[in-house]
């Protein structure tokens, strides 16, 4: 997402490089590139015109700070305006003073509404809120079955009355059921249409009137481009939305919908979908999204994703093994699977400042393939070989057997083992506080040190940043999650 937009904006900054100040004349070329970039990203034309006018006014009237180049100052102006357009700050879901909180989901067919409903339920369950899903889509074949299947997958109950019942009555009874059972939140999945029509809007209005929702969330497919603006406007004028969920941002969408929805409706984007898995839903933070658009990464989201997967106790054990030079292939496999659990390699890389626009899709695909090869190699080892990598260094017959087991050459196996040994040694030295100034090393496939990725430097693991070992937890203290820094 936003790759083409980020590349285009990079061209805009070059128009101001070498200038000693921002003026009415020299900013025009940069603004043309920004305008072209936004239009190619499918941002609504009216939003683009307003955006450019605001940037021009602020850029020309801004005093360039001593030591800051004009192109850097211009980037700051564009960043601030992007944040402003997308809503300034994250807007959390409403929560009723008296349970249940009722959330009505709306949107066109194919936008991913039912999946987004389940994703939202899982997000709330992780926050400790009990949730009930209500299936009112009685028109689409298997829509109710789909929601029931997703509900079982995330361990959230689903209320339904079959495909012959009235959607308004299903919604009303579902909310009442939640009230009787003391459930915190009800999420009502409604029927979609291939296009907006009077019948659809009338039914939505009746459901809304019957259940008086605290949130009306419009699910928007980010791949519909400029139509996102008119779609949002139509739903807001007829139903009155309180926010939006933008889906499929991990695909080939240009991302322009993210810049149009708030400005057109005045209502915030509250979540974005970044994959098909039910875990692939993130709260929308305008300042973080602006940072991604400008190729500056998103460290906070990276940290949050890691905190969900990393346990402090595991970090301490791993650090102790590294200090004792006992880091083995079993540990390495755990680290690889941790990376997988955090999402795709492409999504992970693009959250890292400075890397998002530097690594092309082919390199990312190569990195993904190599991760699979290394995992296959480790899976072909015996438990003893995983625990003692030196066995493989000294035994050609073991390497031959592993190569046959994972479909790779003996030379490839030998190279991966050598790189692993180098990585293990350097990780031990780095965890003891050595190797200053080695930032940027260790990215899989890009000159870094994960075995099989074309380099001997170590891949920095969460918690191993050249600091001393973390302090031991006191007995009885609550287990914490995080990097262990």
UniProtKB/Swiss-Prot annotation:
PROSITE patterns per the UniProt record, alphabetical: SRP54
Task: Tell me yes or no: is RNA-binding among this UniProt entry's keywords.
Answer: yes
Q: Which UniProt keywords apply?
A: Cytoplasm, GTP-binding, Hydrolase, Nucleotide-binding, Ribonucleoprotein, RNA-binding, Signal recognition particle
GO CC entries: signal recognition particle
Does Magnesium count among this protein's keywords?
no
Q: Where is this region: Disordered?
A: 452-485
Basic residues bias: where?
A: 471-485
| Source species, domain of life | Bacteria
Record-listed GTP binding positions: 107-114, 189-193, 247-250
Q: Which InterPro entries match?
A: AAA+_ATPase, P-loop_NTPase, Signal_recog_part_SRP54_M_sf, Signal_recog_particl_SRP54_hlx, Signal_recog_particle_SRP54_M, SRP, SRP54, SRP54_GTPase_dom
Record's catalysed reaction(s): GTP + H2O = GDP + phosphate + H(+)
Q: Where in the cell is it found?
A: Cytoplasm
Q: Which GO terms describe its molecular function?
A: 7S RNA binding; ATP hydrolysis activity; GTP binding; GTPase activity
EC class: hydrolase
Q: What does this protein do?
A: Involved in targeting and insertion of nascent membrane proteins into the cytoplasmic membrane. Binds to the hydrophobic signal sequence of the ribosome-nascent chain (RNC) as it emerges from the ribosomes. The SRP-RNC complex is then targeted to the cytoplasmic membrane where it interacts with the SRP receptor FtsY.
> So what family is this one in?
Belongs to the GTP-binding SRP family. SRP54 subfamily.
Q: How does it assemble?
A: Part of the signal recognition particle protein translocation system, which is composed of SRP and FtsY.
Q: Which HAMAP family match?
A: SRP54
Query: PANTHER family in the record, alphabetically?
Result: SIGNAL RECOGNITION PARTICLE 54K PROTEIN SRP54, SIGNAL RECOGNITION PARTICLE SUBUNIT SRP54
Q: What information about domains appears in the record's comments?
A: Composed of three domains: the N-terminal N domain, which is responsible for interactions with the ribosome, the central G domain, which binds GTP, and the C-terminal M domain, which binds the RNA and the signal sequence of the RNC.
* Name recorded for this polypeptide: Signal recognition particle protein
Q: Which organism is it from?
A: Synechococcus elongatus (strain ATCC 33912 / PCC 7942 / FACHB-805) (Anacystis nidulans R2)
Species lineage = Bacteria, Bacillati, Cyanobacteriota, Cyanophyceae, Synechococcales
What's the name of its gene?
ffh
């Amino acid at each position: 997402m936003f790759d083409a937009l980020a590349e285009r904006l990079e061209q805009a900054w070059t128009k101001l490089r070498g200038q000693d100040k921002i003026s009415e004349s020299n900013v025009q070329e940069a603004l043309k590139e920004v305008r072209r970039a936004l239009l190619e990203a499918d941002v609504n034309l009216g939003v683009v015109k307003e955006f450019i006018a605001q940037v021009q006014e602020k850029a020309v009237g801004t005093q360039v700070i001593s030591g800051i180049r004009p192109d850097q100052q211009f980037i700051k102006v564009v960043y601030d305006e992007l944040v402003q357009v997308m809503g300034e700050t994250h807007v959390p879901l409403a929560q009723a003073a008296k349970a249940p909180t009722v959330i009505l989901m709306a949107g066109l067919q194919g936008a991913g509404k039912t999946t987004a409903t389940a994703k939202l339920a899982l997000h709330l369950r992780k926050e400790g809120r009990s949730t009930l899903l209500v299936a009112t889509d009685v028109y689409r074949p298997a829509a109710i079955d789909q929601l029931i299947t997703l509900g079982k997958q995330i361990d959230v109950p689903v209320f339904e009355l079959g495909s012959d019942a009235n959607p308004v009555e299903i919604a009303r009874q579902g909310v009442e059921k939640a009230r009787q059972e003391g459930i915190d939140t009800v999420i009502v999945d409604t029927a979609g249409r291939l296009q907006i029509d009077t019948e659809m809007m009338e039914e939505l209005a009746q459901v809304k009137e019957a259940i008086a929702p605290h949130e009306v969330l419009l699910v928007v497919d980010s791949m519909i481009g400029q139509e996102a603006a008119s779609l949002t406007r139509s739903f807001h004028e007829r139903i009155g939305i309180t926010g939006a969920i933008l889906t499929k941002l991990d695909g080939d969408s240009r991302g322009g919908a993210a810049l149009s929805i708030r400005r057109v409706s005045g209502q915030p984007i509250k979540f974005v979908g970044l994959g098909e898995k039910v875990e692939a839903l993130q709260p929308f933070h305008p300042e973080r999204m602006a940072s991604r658009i400008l190729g500056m990464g998103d460290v906070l989201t990276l940290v949050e994703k890691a905190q969900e997967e990393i346990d402090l106790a595991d970090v301490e054990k791993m650090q102790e093994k590294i200090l004792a030079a006992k880091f083995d292939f079993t540990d390495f496999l755990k680290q690889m699977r941790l990376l997988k659990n955090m999402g795709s390699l492409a999504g992970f890389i693009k959250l890292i400042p400075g890397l998002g626009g530097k690594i092309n899709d082919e390199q990312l695909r190569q990195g993904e393939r190599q991760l699979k090869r290394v995992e296959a190699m480790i899976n072909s080892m015996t438990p003893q070989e995983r625990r003692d990598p030196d066995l493989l260094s000294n035994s050609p017959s073991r390497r031959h057997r592993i190569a046959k087991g994972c479909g790779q050459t003996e030379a490839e196996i030998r190279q991966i083992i050598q790189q692993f040994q180098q990585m293990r040694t350097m990780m031990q030295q780095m965890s003891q506080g050595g190797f200053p100034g080695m930032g940027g090393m260790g990215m899989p496939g890009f000159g870094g040190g994960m075995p099989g990725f074309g380099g001997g430097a170590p891949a920095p693991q969460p918690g191993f940043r050249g600091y001393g070992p973390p302090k031991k937890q006191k007995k009885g203290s609550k287990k914490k999650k995080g990097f262990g820094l």
